[in-house]
Amino acid sequence: MPTRDPREPFGRVTVAEAKQLLDEGKAVMVDVREPNEYAEVHAKGVRLVPVNHVITEVPQIRDFAGGKEVLFICRSGQRSALAAEYAVAAGLGDLPLYNVEGGTLAWVEAGFPTGD
């Protein structure tokens, strides 16, 4: 079940919760790593928006989300938390936003689908 810290403007989900939300069609996932990291391995179906582009890409993220929840993922969960904060600051706070804890490392370790 997603958790929320009242000090943060976003929630947190495990990779298992993220996969369930994606499988149920309730969420989309945005990978905020750099293109070279993304090219090595990424969760299936994610959209690449490097963390330093999140603020300028909010309209594209909103379009990609289509009203669904937005899950931010990075390598381990640090940059994706920052990306969620940036997204809120840039006006995306009206959508449910989540940081995927453990990031791509945990996604791969869990054996969840990767690639395009």
Q: What kind of region is each of these model predictions?
A:
Residues 1-27, 35-69, 78-116:
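Rhodanese-like catalytic fold shared by cysteine-dependent sulfurtransferases
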Residues 30:
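Conserved beta/loop motifs at nucleotide-recognition and modification sites
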Residues 73:
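Short, surface-exposed ligand- or partner-binding patches at beta-edge/loop junctions that are enriched
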